[in-house]
Regions:
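Membrane-embedded segments
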Residues: 46-133
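Active-site segments of SGNH/GDSL-like serine hydrolases
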Residues: 222-247
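Residue-level recognition of beta-strand->loop/alpha-helix junctions
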Residues: 68, 236, 271-273
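Short hydrophobic beta-strand that contains or immediately precedes a catalytic carboxylate
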Residues: 40-43
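Long, positively charged, glycine-interspersed low-complexity recognition regions
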Residues: 248-317
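Hydrophobic membrane-insertion alpha-helices, especially the h-region
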Residues: 1-18
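Secreted/periplasmic serine-hydrolase-like ester/acetyl group-modifying domain
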Residues: 112-228
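Alpha-helical transmembrane signal-anchor/signal-peptide segments
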Residues: 20-38
């Protein structure tokens, strides 16, 4: 019986090694557990495509890594920060806030494992598993690669296996026709013809529909940074003016809710759609979609603005 168990475990490990893809989160987690950074940026896809730590460092003199990704909820950010604190001593957490993520639930699928799968053995990983992953469909836990299309992964088995075994984290593997991943964790999207963009409804904040678990983990993260003397700044990146106008009621309600929340928590909240609206363009030409994901040139310009605002806020405090 024991031998059968050992064989099963070995087989699952081999399948995981060969079939689970090398994602950019693999590079991200490897970077933050093996290097020291002053700033850690967590949040959603807006943060991933809009905030370039290398550009910010040119202004602030502070090193940073971008751990944002689409599908990253409060629980993910919380355990990512706990993992980082086990391995290094960040000076500041920059939390990119997308209001829509606080009225929706984390969906099962490959994003559920995107972060956890890359965690090294640690206290944070055990806690993360117990409070999040253990609630998944058992297939997600035992067969993490099943969430990915085998027709896509099978032709890449050799490359995937080689990258993992050799410890290859070359960012060129993560480049596509539409974007490229940088060592800083930033993803640069290439410019698009905005005249051909189609509107799609973004994740919208709905008054009275806040998911309490999501807010609870945000509160836990704020409390954790206080316990560990880590600076904390919340940021909402610019959204195209077309989208702000189309869903003005939703966004106005969101700005009011989060403005009040962060004020009560004693957290600096930099909202580039209200107080800092005029510091950066909301023209659709700077973006790659109506949701607000910037192209690389715009992200570089915005990152400079964000860094300058962060510096000015720091001087005031």
């Amino acid at each position: 019986m024991f031998l059968v168990l050992v064989v099963c475990v070995a087989l699952l490990a081999a399948l995981d090694l060969a079939l689970y893809p090398c994602t950019f989160m693999r590079n991200d987690v490897h970077a933050v557990v093996t290097q020291q950074f002053d700033d850690i940026i967590v949040g959603t896809s807006h943060g991933k495509m809009d905030i370039n730590p290398d550009v910010m460092e040119e202004v602030t003199g502070r090193s940073g890594h971008n751990l944002c990704v689409g599908g990253e909820y409060g629980i993910d950010a919380y355990y990512l920060v706990k993992l980082i604190k086990e391995k290094q001593n960040p000076k500041r957490i920059i939390y990119e806030v997308d209001p829509g993520y606080f009225v929706s639930e984390k969906e099962e699928g490959n994003n559920y494992l995107l972060f956890y799968h890359e965690f090294p053995i640690s206290k944070a990983k055990v806690e993360y598993f117990w409070n999040s992953i253990a609630k998944c469909n058992f297939r997600t836990v035992l067969f993490p690669w099943y969430e990915y299309s085998l027709s896509y992964e099978l032709p890449k088995v050799k490359d995937t296996f080689t990258q993992k075994v050799s410890g290859d984290y070359d960012v060129s593997h993560l480049k596509s026709d539409s974007q490229e991943y940088h060592e800083s964790g930033f993803i640069e999207r290439y410019p698009v013809d905005v005249t051909k963009l189609k509107k799609s409804e973004p994740k919208l904040y709905e008054e009275g529909q806040v998911n309490e678990e999501n807010m609870e983990y945000l509160k836990k993260l704020i409390a954790y940074r206080k316990e560990n003397d880590i600076e904390f700044v919340a940021v909402t990146t610019p959204i195209p003016i077309n989208t702000l106008k189309d869903y003005s009621d939703n966004y106005n309600a969101a700005w009011k809710y989060f403005g009040q929340f962060f004020e009560e928590q004693g957290v600096e909240y930099l909202n580039f759609n209200t107080e800092y609206f005029k510091t950066f363009t909301h023209d659709l030409k700077a973006y790659t979609d109506y949701d607000g994901h910037m192209n690389g040139d715009a992200a570089e310009a915005y990152s400079k603005v964000l860094a300058q605002v962060l510096d000015s806020v720091g001087q005031k405090n």
